[in-house]
């Protein structure tokens, strides 16, 4: 998207310029309390937006740097590259674009951290976190003036999700994750999609028809919290026990 690619490119010009000139880099670090602007992430997407967030965090420090007497008297201030960086840092339009980028990217950065993390299995969380990320992005663009931008952001996310991640296995994993599934079950469309994903995976992984029927019956009990899933202990454990432990306890 032009609205994001342009500020990202300008931010890259700023950081490249600063990091290529030792004295300017030292002055920048003095203004930012020793903190760097470039923030590495797990992907190029994450790196770009983490760097934008760092620039935004140090916006005032950067403005002070590029209006200081030291900068004004420097040879760099008279170069074409220096003038461009100076204009970028003092541009209200640039900082507004950065804020839009951050509103769109922050929920996705959280999702990337979950997917890339070691502390919990990614698959049962991925689809729930994607839906939550989209919800947060919508909340980050509440004004009508940003409605078109929001629509295009969500369209890109949905297209990427469909191309790369919208696999029945992810939906089945979320369906079988009770501490997420029952929060989503109130949405009839989402509940139907997850049930369909589970059924598709079941038909592929369990060829025996009798066993399929038995598992499907247990799935219905799980959905409706009937049978062994209806006892108080099982219901209380929905939010605390791991999905595998809960199903082991309820289907023995």
Language-model-detected regions and their locations in the chain:
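Short alpha-helical patches at protein termini and domain edges
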Residues: 1-252
């Amino acid at each position: 998207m032009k609205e994001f690619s342009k500020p990202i490119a300008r931010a890259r010009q700023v950081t490249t310029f600063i990091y290529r000139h030792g004295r300017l880099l030292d002055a920048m670090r003095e203004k930012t309390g020793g903190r760097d602007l470039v923030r590495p992430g797990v992907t190029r997407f994450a790196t770009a937006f983490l760097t934008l967030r760092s620039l935004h965090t140090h916006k005032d420090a950067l403005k002070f740097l590029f209006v200081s007497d030291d900068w004004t008297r420097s040879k760099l201030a008279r170069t074409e590259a220096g003038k461009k960086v100076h204009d970028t840092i003092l541009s209200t339009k640039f900082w507004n674009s950065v804020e839009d980028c951050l509103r769109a990217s922050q929920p996705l950065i959280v999702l990337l951290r979950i997917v890339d993390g070691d502390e919990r299995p990614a698959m049962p969380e991925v689809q729930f976190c994607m839906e939550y990320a989209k919800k947060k992005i919508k909340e980050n663009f509440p004004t009508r003036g940003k409605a078109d931008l929001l629509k295009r952001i969500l369209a890109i996310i949905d297209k990427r999700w469909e191309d790369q991640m919208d696999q029945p296995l992810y939906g089945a994993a979320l369906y079988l994750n009770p501490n997420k599934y029952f929060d989503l079950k109130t949405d009839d469309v989402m509940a139907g999609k997850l049930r369909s994903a589970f059924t598709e995976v079941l038909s592929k992984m369990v060829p025996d028809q009798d066993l399929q029927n038995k598992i499907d019956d247990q799935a219905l009990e799980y959905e409706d919290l009937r049978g062994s899933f209806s006892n108080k202990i099982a219901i209380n454990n929905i939010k605390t026990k791991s999905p595998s432990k809960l199903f082991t306890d309820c289907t023995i």
